[in-house]
Structure formats: structure tokens, C-alpha cells
Amino acid sequence: MPNTLDLSGFAITLVERGLQGLPVAEQVDAFCRDVTQAGFRARRFNMSIGTLHPRHGAHSYVWRRDEGLATELHPRRPEGVSEGYLKSPIYRLRNTDEVTLRRRLDAGGPVDFPILEDLREAGMTDYAARLVSFGEAQQRDPTKLFDPKRSRPD
């Protein structure tokens, strides 16, 4: 497996599928299959998109290598966001200047997010997260969408 997670070569295909109007679920499933066929040993992939729906705050697409794709709707909560979200890597990325986060899970040391302990217990060895804004594909070269050296999305 490559030591660095370079997904830039997949960005153009991802954007092209989006421009073809393929449903998001099909795009996510195809992306995950492409990545694993290219040699990345991905076991789980999650993409969440915030919504403007009055009852649903977000829509998640969760792909697991052994199970395929599932979708989840996250209801808006009168009390605000869930405790799990507040303790998640994505919450951290959305509320700091960071754009990427990567953690080795096989090092045996403590982890800084509860989800990472769950993933470690499931046998996963690496975790990577990346914020991508909708405007990036239109404003920049699509091959740069997954560049870990990029600055925070606009």
C-alpha cells in the first residue's frame, strides 16, 4: 500500500461523474471501488453533506468494503448537534484552520477521538479526513482537490 494517500488522480473522474448528473450515491460507490481497485486498502469511507432541509441536518454516504454503500439521514436536533459530532474529527476540521487530519491507528498509543478507537477495535490501521468545499471543483484545478498541502477551502 502506498505510504501517502494521493487521490489527486481520481479527482477528474469524480468531477466528470458529477457533471454527468449521476446520483451522489452512485458517485461515492464508484469512487470507493476505483480507489480500492487501484490498491488502496480502504475498508470504510464516509461523506457527509449538510442540507437545507427543515428536518434533516445532513445526509451521509457510508461505504464499507464488505457491505457496500448505505445512506443515513441525520435529523436536526432542537438541542443542537450531537455529542458524538462535537467529539469527532470532522467537527475539529470544520472549527479550526485545518483541512486534513490523519492518524495512524496501529501505533498502539492513545487516540484523540472516540471514533478512532472504534475503528482501531474493528482492525483498521489508518484514518484520513479531508474537507472539500463545493466551490473548489469550479474554482480550481480538480486534480488539486485532494492535495494535502493545500490551504483551507474558501
Predicted ranges, named:
Residues 29-33, 117, 134:
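A broad, structural surface signal
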Residues 20-68:
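Helix-loop-beta substructure at the N-terminus of cytosolic sensory domains
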Residues 1-21, 26:
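Signal-transmission linkers at sensory-effector interfaces
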Residues 46-53, 105-109, 130-137:
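Short, glycine/charge-rich beta-strand/loop segments that flank catalytic centers
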Residues 126-154:
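Sensory-domain boundary capping and coupling elements
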Residues 57-61, 73, 139-141:
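Short, conserved acidic/polar surface loops in the N-terminal third of protein domains
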Residues 66-128:
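Regulatory sensory and allosteric helical modules in signal-transduction proteins
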